């Protein structure tokens, strides 16, 4: 079974979000199941030179893009037993950021065409082409509409994964006409047209043999208007080929037993070492070293989606509790400034790190007691999974993957691995925080809750099995 992942980012090469984590970890787990997964992505100038040096030139071809042919170098390399192909074109990929350029429509039209033009020149036969998010959605669409009659492509099946429906790749019609050479028959509501523009993600949804969302709850949510980003009707139409498969975490990277970034390694039977991580975190930020004061942390993009309006509304009420708060992340200036002001107002209780620091993030996960994630929507979420693996109990809103992975503690049965609330309401969140703090001070209950969190399986194993079955169903 040969699978080609077409992605715009992938760990360890480049990362801007959770897509890169999925593209880096899922293929490794699928390989353990006997699936040959290879990955194709742009050869960005942002890729570390050491990784670029590990690739060799496999082939040079021309890619037709509208009225012209564009250079395409196919580089080939291997990392952790996985084969990678990098599409080389400095005009499109020698940039100071992955996305957000005036010509993104052209850049990813080129990449989509390049993926398809490369397939006959790769040294393996593709059974399933698996595209991800808007950046490679048109690979699947173009395969069906322009390449399917070619014997080299006719047996290839397609899967399309929606990681975040909010970002759809919407561009002027000229992209479709001039670059992709698609005529008027594609510019209507049953094809690519979307409120006067062209929508790449819509093309992926329409053309793919199977569609997955990154959690079962998110799969249901995106079929409703509130979460559907104007594509809910289309997703309801194609419900029969839509499924939800929850993401996992790479346990070779996020594992408190082996993590070299944290002060003291530990497992569910050596939680006293977790306390050492808490002290180290307090020392790092200059917080009072108070063992019985819970640390509530957030490692997040500071954006509206992450529920920060709820946090902002009741933050001073949270501060009335005996707690310490640590926020690590960057994003919208209004939230950055708010948390910096709170750190100034509560210097003994609040610390903020604007930016991202991988090593510090690991220490925050290991040293905190509670992890706050009150998202407005959350397709899957990785933060809560990492927190659970480190025995840091999540407080989440019941949406998307948060609803699938965090099960609210039930004091009657003792079951659960975290705390959750349903409505997007600041005082519902505050009540849940109070409840979590109350149980934090009941040490036997808390220790049991932490052990339950740490002993569940958050790896990619079950998800990889589900993807393998999906691929298998397409090939039968």
Swiss-Prot record:
CDD domains, A to Z: GT5_Glycogen_synthase_DULL1-like
MF annotations from Gene Ontology: alpha-1,4-glucan glucosyltransferase (ADP-glucose donor) activity; alpha-1,4-glucan glucosyltransferase (UDP-glucose donor) activity
Protease keyword on record: no
Q: Name one GO biological process term.
A: glycogen biosynthetic process
Q: Which reaction does it catalyse?
A: [(1->4)-alpha-D-glucosyl](n) + ADP-alpha-D-glucose = [(1->4)-alpha-D-glucosyl](n+1) + ADP + H(+)
Instruction: Keywords in alphabetical order, please.
Output: Glycogen biosynthesis, Glycosyltransferase, Transferase
Q: Which Pfam families match?
A: Glyco_transf_5 (PF08323), Glycos_transf_1 (PF00534)
Biochemical pathway: Glycan biosynthesis; glycogen biosynthesis
Look up the EC number in the record and give it: 2.4.1.21
Q: Does the keyword Cell membrane apply?
A: no
Its signal peptide is: none
InterPro entries xref list: Glyco_trans_1 (IPR001296), GS/SS (IPR011835), Starch_synth_cat_dom (IPR013534)
Highest taxon, organism lineage: Bacteria
Q: Where does ADP-alpha-D-glucose bind?
A: 15
Q: Which NCBIfam families match?
A: glgA, PRK00654.1-1, PRK00654.1-2
**Biological role stated in the UniProt entry:** Synthesizes alpha-1,4-glucan chains using ADP-glucose.
Q: Which family does it belong to?
A: Belongs to the glycosyltransferase 1 family. Bacterial/plant glycogen synthase subfamily.
Name-wise, this protein is Glycogen synthase
The organism encoding this protein is: Bacillus cereus (strain B4264)
Q: Which gene encodes it?
A: glgA
